[in-house]
């Protein structure tokens, strides 16, 4: 039995599906997008759509009017989507003259990392796609946010640095050539472990240097990339060219709005590796990714999407250069003092929408009237902000940033006087421009809105002109508008009246003026739509001519929003301005954990001091019982350094911070089953990374290093780590080491740069009272059994533990209890 030949339409589907690859294919058929075979089953399972069959082929459909909603749902679940459209007229076969299917082909792809306009785009988060390339031991990557056009490249010297950089960016999609994906499985697995992302591959040739560099020079219309500062960055250029080709040639997406790729100077940033970003809960709480108790949530007082994205970018990659920090501190201080000005500007900032992404929609032809209206309102708010700032003596950070370009001022005036207040979603809905924008627009709308009024007025006028009181204007579907008079009055009509029809006792006429009115009425909607469509295109073109000026305005407002957000935070929380310089000092007086402080009643959080001067103290050994605040304190120091190097005020009475180049943390651990690594192995790997990469300007936070093995092994490892960080040249980082190993505290006696501190506890009738104060000296007791009791241990177990502890601390050996002395615990 021969296999049934597919219909011409299904042949089209198979051709499109081959192009779609691993994407779900939505195939336009009339008023629906259909999915077939496995794609139909997938839609049924993930979108709860009805699964049907036709000739044994599974199929499922989505109405054209709601396709974007369903595409977003698929993308949100991590799928890629290809959309095939129908166009033209049905094809005719030459010989039989039979009507064939309409032409169909894929017109666009949608992937998680290439969203242009979607409900999935979060206002204050970039949506990145990152492409990776490797040459020898050197990695290059290119990072693009297609929704804003932001594009930059970077190179990394090793796998750890590459993974940290990509995790810091948290892309939605990672792209590589097929060869890289198949060879670098360890990198792929690490990225999948840390991030929820889509992995995509593209042709190897697109990442070859000759093609990639030519792709970039052609797109940006230059002869060489050297003028962009990209000279010699071969792996990164290859990644950028491969990414651009993937977007343009594979996904068929618009790219003319993509900015010239920038390079990022890593030496000018405080580097925070992936583990530290997670451990310090910069973006999300450890045990609650959607929770609010992160540093980002506490610090974010921004009013605009651009300002929110800028805050997040700086939080995960703060400044290193004291000059950059100082100018932002000055700006924060200025607005902290100018309370009224700050509030006024905040009011206008709240009226500013996402100018970056709106401009992308204009550039790619996706903008509707409402988008242009939103731009108008945002521009107007920006102009009001500049007007507020005009009379102020601005700090250095805002010099040359807060003056309105004259061309942009003219555009704002044009938008304000030409667009209606309440704008439609689509151009085809009409009523975009005010009547006064164009005479033809005014005339057509007037005729449309006052057609019956015009008929009555015209009827009265020609009655007076002819003297025929019974003359009337009527309408018939076949004739349209006509003038009717009794047959006896027909000779009295002027010669320019044109006879249309004769009846038994009446004659019907028209006039050139009535015909013009008839033409206007019959085509008025079409004419209005044609006119407004052209006017809208012209307006968008005019906006695009000022794209550079508009994006400069967007960046200026983002900077302003960022600074005012920090000023609001400092004002609301009573923060202080830290002194930040190139010294070897880390001194904080009455510092508080910025997140923990907000979770307790006002005045209840206990502040603590930190004093580390390179010539005196480089390492603090911190002992004390669990739950006494050790981990909170050491995290607190890292968070305050990050805030200070963002240009922010910090929760302290005063502070002097010499800039830190890198922050490392080793806090807690869990098994990494995907890599076959135990808790202890994870701990050792992270500690090894610190030992290899820390410098004498780094800050190292170590919590209980060595606890995952036997006591002596753990103690030996912990002391070796301490000595390495104390005595190895160029590795003498400022270190806070929380430990239960009392033996380490003796290092203070013969190491001049070590100081012992402990989390204070008061012993009250045998019960510990946690003071949450960090005090000089080492702890005498750990109070671990007390913590076990608080955790709900059975009292018999607690009692036995206390007995064993007394025996361990005394001269006698541990006794084995009688079987009946110990209550048997059930498993369930």
Swiss-Prot record:
Keywords: ATP-binding, DNA damage, DNA repair, DNA-binding, Nucleotide-binding. GO terms for cellular component: cytosol. Pfam families: MutS_I, MutS_II, MutS_III, MutS_IV, MutS_V. GO terms for molecular function: ATP binding; ATP-dependent DNA damage sensor activity; damaged DNA binding; mismatched DNA binding. GO terms for biological process: mismatch repair. Gene3D superfamilies: 1.10.1420.10, DNA repair protein MutS, domain I, MutS, connector domain, P-loop containing nucleotide triphosphate hydrolases. The keyword ATP-binding applies. ATP binds at residues 624-631. This protein is involved in the repair of mismatches in DNA. It is possible that it carries out the mismatch recognition step. This protein has a weak ATPase activity. Belongs to the DNA mismatch repair MutS family. PANTHER family: DNA MISMATCH REPAIR PROTEIN MSH1, MITOCHONDRIAL, DNA MISMATCH REPAIR PROTEIN MUTS FAMILY MEMBER. This is DNA mismatch repair protein MutS. It comes from Chlamydia pneumoniae.
